[in-house]
Amino acid sequence: MTSVVVIGTQWGDEGKGKITDFLSQDAEVIARYQGGDNAGHTIVIDGKKFKLHLIPSGVFFPEKISVIGNGVVVNPKSLVKELEYLHTEGVSTENLRISDRAHVILPYHIKLDQLQEAAKGDNKIGTTNKGIGPAYMDKAARVGIRIADLLDKEIFASRLKTNLAEKNRLFSKMYESEELSFDEIFEEYYAYGQQIKQYVTDTSVILNDALDAGKRVLFEGAQGVMLDIDQGTYPFVTSSNPVAGGVTIGSGIGPSKINKVVGVCKAYTSRVGDGPFPTELFDEVGERIREVGHEYGTTTGRPRRVGWFDSVVMRHSRRVSGITNLSLNCIDVLSGLDTVKICVAYDLDGERIDYYPASLEQLKRCKPIYEELPGWEEDITGCRSLDELPENARNYVRRIGELVGIRISTFSVGPGREQTNILESVWSNI
């Protein structure tokens, strides 16, 4: 039994897709366990970029099984579009498996998401308007439609009719918006269900059988710990649990079957949308990092907010997810800066604190306490070991490991597979 979980430790966009793709080379099964097509990951293979939102990174390895677990909310329209995109690019999807227990995102979820966000005005959360939150709301309210229901024509029609009647009352009475058509949704989405039917199964059985057989299973998280609905910057969070504990609920395996947790982070910090961000930069340094790092959302295309590396955030992520290994990405983006900074603690009303407050009001008053280190001018994109890094870059990497309290197992100096460097194999000693 060998399993590794890959999670984002910041606010998403840390490069999980690339690290998952890299670790997938030694895995036999790769699974997603939460989120939906609000996630976006970019994989570079032989210099070519592939952008995925739902399908796990492991799909590029035809000999491995890729799983969309029960904790994922699936937009069938987006899924079919992504499958067609992969087929057009010559990528086989015969190795894909989709949980019959996963919940379905329907047009009324997307419309409700958009209307609710617009109604919030200045208090908007910064949702991607993909219907993720409303789909999870229906799941919690026990009125959601699952993949298994989508494949059964009579059950899908019955549940869709009931749900749509309720949602249309909401649209017309509360939001004074146009109602949606039952016939249009039913015909379109039942057809999508038939197109994905070949991939649908009980994925919990597949995952547990693989683990019991001693196979290497890799779990791929979406978003990041700071967007977790329980442990993140609530309410500026997603509607699921990206933390490592979400694996057990979202994939159908027991907690005793998780061996290692790899936390992925950037050498700086970024986030999309609204919410607290203590180390955010508003100056020319921030603009430089954004442009050099191509910090624009994979899903939304929105410019990401950027800031210095925050070890307070990282220690919080380590604690709530039990992170055993750290993967540090995008070190190359900081090349050329005279000085680099790491937030080591916060100043809250004159008191030094080293934890991340739950209160948004307290977070607004938190001022980052920085440790400054000398930067480096060298181009490090060709470095293939820690020793090859310039001394200042090497010291920066080591200091991050010390402050976070996690050993760094991989570091990357660019988007390519060959630019990801192993210091310690996470598959060893399990």
Curated annotation (Swiss-Prot):
Which InterPro entries does the entry mention?
Adenylosuccin_syn_GTP-bd, Adenylosuccin_syn_Lys_AS, Adenylosuccinate_synth_dom1, Adenylosuccinate_synth_dom2, Adenylosuccinate_synth_dom3, Adenylosuccinate_synthetase, P-loop_NTPase
Keyword Isomerase set for record:
no
In which pathway is this protein known to take part? Purine metabolism; AMP biosynthesis via de novo pathway; AMP from IMP: step 1/2
Molecular-function GO terms, alphabetical: adenylosuccinate synthase activity; GTP binding; magnesium ion binding
* Keyword annotations of the record: Cytoplasm, GTP-binding, Ligase, Magnesium, Metal-binding, Nucleotide-binding, Purine biosynthesis
Gene3D superfamilies registered for this protein in UniProt: Adenylosuccinate Synthetase, subunit A, domain 1 (3.40.440.10), Adenylosuccinate Synthetase, subunit A, domain 2 (1.10.300.10), Adenylosuccinate Synthetase, subunit A, domain 3 (3.90.170.10)
Please verify whether the record's keywords include Endoplasmic reticulum. Answer: no
What is the reaction catalyzed? IMP + L-aspartate + GTP = N(6)-(1,2-dicarboxyethyl)-AMP + GDP + phosphate + 2 H(+)
- Please state what class of enzyme this protein is: ligase
Task: Give the annotated active site.
Answer: 13 (proton acceptor), 41 (proton donor)
Residues annotated for GTP binding in this entry: 12-18, 40-42, 304, 330-332, 412-414
Q: What Pfam families does the record tag this protein with?
A: Adenylsucc_synt (PF00709)
Q: What residues form the membrane-spanning segments?
A: none
Q: Which cofactor does it need?
A: Mg(2+)
Q: What is its main location?
A: cytoplasm
Q: Which EC number applies? A: 6.3.4.4
List residues binding IMP. Answer: 13-16, 38-41, 128, 142, 223, 238, 302
Entry's Gene Ontology cellular component terms:
cytoplasm
Coiled-coil annotated spans: none
**Where in the cell does this protein reside?**
Cytoplasm
Q: What does this protein do?
A: Plays an important role in the de novo pathway of purine nucleotide biosynthesis. Catalyzes the first committed step in the biosynthesis of AMP from IMP.
Oligomeric form and interacting partners: Homodimer.
Q: Which NCBIfam families match?
A: PRK01117.1, purA
Q: What is this protein called?
A: Adenylosuccinate synthetase
